[in-house]
Amino acid sequence: MKPGNTSFNMVSFRMVWTAMMATLLVAGASSAGTRSSEDLSAPEDRSLSKRLVFDPSCAGVYDRVLLGKLNRLCDDCYNVFREPNVATECRSNCFYNLAFVQCLEYLMPPSLHEEYQANVQMVGK
């Protein structure tokens, strides 16, 4: 092995290592910077502020699990179509709308449609 090749390999290794470390630092800093003040609040504050996110027109049972399932369906629908209004329209009128039905039909197997429709009825009474 020539001495020149060894120094070149060492320089290449250092450059790659430096680039990897810089990438890790940037990724760590950006993920730490995305935490909202809601994430940093006290646990009792979190439940109240998260409840405010849901549509006040949902006058039925406030069940966090059911609302979470319905919200996730709308989020998944937005992630598939990437249309700005999909998630908002899907959640409008407490999930009782055509956009929600279309998302449900597109994303969920038919065997779960009835369950989701029952969940909409339960939270939107």
Swiss-Prot record:
InterPro entries: Crust_neurhormone_CS (IPR018251), Crust_neurohorm (IPR031098), Crust_neurohorm_sf (IPR035957), Hyperglycemic (IPR001166), Hyperglycemic1 (IPR000346). The modification Valine amide is found at V123. GO terms for molecular function: neuropeptide hormone activity. Pfam families: Crust_neurohorm. Disulfide bonds join C58-C94, C74-C90, C77-C103. One of its GO terms (cellular component) is extracellular region. Produced by the medulla terminalis X-organ in the eyestalks and transported to the sinus gland where they are stored and released. Its main location: secreted. GO terms for biological process: circadian rhythm; glucose metabolic process; neuropeptide signaling pathway. It is found in: Secreted. Residues 1-34 form the signal peptide. Keywords: Amidation, Carbohydrate metabolism, Cleavage on pair of basic residues, Disulfide bond, Glucose metabolism, Hormone, Neuropeptide, Secreted, Signal. The keyword Ribosomal protein does not apply. The keyword Signal applies. Belongs to the arthropod CHH/MIH/GIH/VIH hormone family. Hormone found in the sinus gland of isopods and decapods which controls the blood sugar level. Has a secretagogue action over the amylase released from the midgut gland. May act as a stress hormone and may be involved in the control of molting and reproduction. This is Crustacean hyperglycemic hormones 5. It comes from Penaeus japonicus.
